[in-house]
Regions:
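Catalytic-core regions of glycoside hydrolase
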Residues: 4-5, 113-269
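Feature activates predominantly on carbohydrate-active enzymes
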Residues: 1-87, 94, 100-104, 136
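Conserved beta-strand positions in the central sheet of alpha/beta enzyme cores
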Residues: 31, 107-109, 239
Length: 339
C-alpha cells in the first residue's frame, strides 16, 4: 500500500488501524508518502521532523514491524532540488534521521513535478548515490524505490529517452514504479511488456485505486477488477493507492491482498463480498447495498470508470427507455429500483 494521495492525510489512529489490517490480510508493504505532508516534500523535505511528528512516525514504524509490514518512508524533493553536494548531503541526513526512528525502507518520488528535477540522468545519479552510500552501507535496509516523472505510458516520451536513461543508469537493485497506460488504469500484460524493456527491470506497480483525489465527491467502494490475472511474473511488486477515507478504502485493499496473493484464482465479486463482511460483519447486507451504488467515479479527466448499481441496471434501462420513448413510467421497473 502507498499512502500517496492528494488531500487530507490520514490521522495517526487511522494509520495504526490500517497497519493492523495489513497484518491480518498479509499485506507486507506500507509506503508513507502523503502529498500534503510538508516534511515529505517541498518546502521542508530538507528538514528533520519536529519531535512530536517524529515520535508519531516511530510509533507507526514499530506497529508495522509488529504486523510484519515493511515501513517505507518516501521523500519528494524534485520540485526544488538542486543537483549539488549540499542537497545530496541534506537528503542523506534526512534519511539518517528516519533510520534513527526505525525506518528500514526508503523511496524517492519525482512524480508530478516540472523543471530541473525531471532530468533522468540526475535522478539516476542521485538514486545510485543513495543506494551506494546509504542503503548498501546500512545492510539492513530494503531495496530503494524510485517513483519516476514519466510514470505512465501516456506521459512517456520514448524518443526523449527518459525511461531508457533510468534503465541504463540505475543500479540493478533499485525498483521503479509504474501506474500503467495512464495515471489511473488497470494493469495488464501489454503495459508491462511496454515498460519493462525500457527500465531493464520488472516494474513496481503503483495502482491508483481506490484513490479518489481526482473525484473527491465520490466513494469508490465496488469490486476490484480489470487487472490481468497473468502478470505476477512481470512485476516486482504491487501497491495500491487508497482514498483519503481510510476505513472505506479497506473494501478495496482487502481485495488487492486477495489479488496479489492468489492472482490466477482471483474472483472479484467473491472477494468483494468477503471484504464487505470483514469490514462490517453485523451489517454486511446494508454495506453491500451502499457499496454497490457507490463504485463509479463518474466522468473524470483520467477517463477511468467502474461499474455501478449492476443489479438494477436492467430496470434502470427500462425506466429510461419508457420515459424517453413514451414519456411514461415502467411500473415494474420502478418497483424493482425502489426495492
Amino acid at each position: 500500500m502507498v499512502e500517496g494521495f492528494y488531500g487530507a492525510p490520514w490521522s495517526q489512529e487511522a494509520r495504526i488501524r490500517q497497519l493492523d489490517f495489513y497484518g491480518r490480510n498479509k499485506m507486507n508493504v506500507y509506503i508513507y508518502g502523503p502529498k500534503d505532508d510538508p516534511y515529505h516534500r517541498t518546502p521542508n523535505w530538507r528538514k528533520p521532523y519536529p519531535a512530536r511528528e517524529g515520535e508519531e512516525l516511530k510509533v507507526l514504524v514499530n506497529r508495522a514491524k509488529e504486523n510484519n509490514v515493511i515501513f517505507y518512508w518516501a521523500i519528494h524533493p524534485g520540485q526544488d532540488i538542486r543537483w549539488n553536494e549540499e542537497d545530496r548531503s541534506l537528503l542523506l541526513q534526512k534519511f539518517e534521521s528516519m533510520y534513527q526512528l526505525g525506518v528500514r525502507g526508503f523511496a524517492v518520488f519525482f512524480d508530478d513535478i516540472s523543471g530541473e528535477g525531471t532530468k533522468a540522468d540526475k535522478q539516476a545519479e542521485l538514486l545510485n548515490y543513495i543506494d551506494d552510500h546509504f542503503v548498501k552501507v546500512k545492510r539492513d535496509v530494503a531495496p530503494l524505490i524510485l517513483c519516476p516523472t514519466e510514470y505512465n505510458k501516456s506521459w512517456t516520451d520514448v524518443e526523449g529517452g527518459y525511461l531508457t536513461t533510468l534503465g541504463d543508469k540505475l543500479n540493478e537493485g533499485i525498483k521503479v514504479m509504474w501506474t500503467g497506460d495512464m495515471v489511473v488504469a488497470t494493469i495488464d500484460k501489454s503495459t508491462l511488456d511496454f515498460v519493462n524493456p525500457l527500465l531493464k527491470r520488472k516494474a513496481y506497480i503503483w495502482w491508483n485505486f481506490p484513490v479518489s483525489d481526482y473525484v473527491q465527491d465520490h466513494l469508490l467502494l465496488g469490486p476490484v477488477y480489470g487487472n490481468g490475472l497473468d502478470v505476477k511474473d512481470d512485476m516486482s511488486a504491487f501497491v495500491s493507492n487508497p482514498m483519503e477515507h481510510a476505513e472505506a478504502s479497506k473494501i478495496s485493499l482487502y481485495s488487492v491482498a486477495d489479488y496479489t496473493w492468489n492472482m490466477e484464482n482471483y474472483d472479484s465479486e467473491t472477494s468483494w463480498k468477503h471484504a464487505v463482511r470483514d469490514l462490517m460483519p453485523l451489517h454486511a447486507e446494508y454495506l453491500e447495498i451502499f457499496a454497490a451504488h457507490n463504485s463509479d467515479p463518474g466522468q473524470n479527466g483520467h477517463r477511468f470508470r467502474r461499474e455501478e448499481s449492476v443489479a438494477i441496471q436492467p430496470a434502470l434501462s427500462a425506466l429510461l427507455k419508457a420515459y424517453q420513448e413514451k414519456n411514461e413510467i415502467d411500473e415494474d421497473a420502478y418497483r424493482q429500483v425502489a426495492e
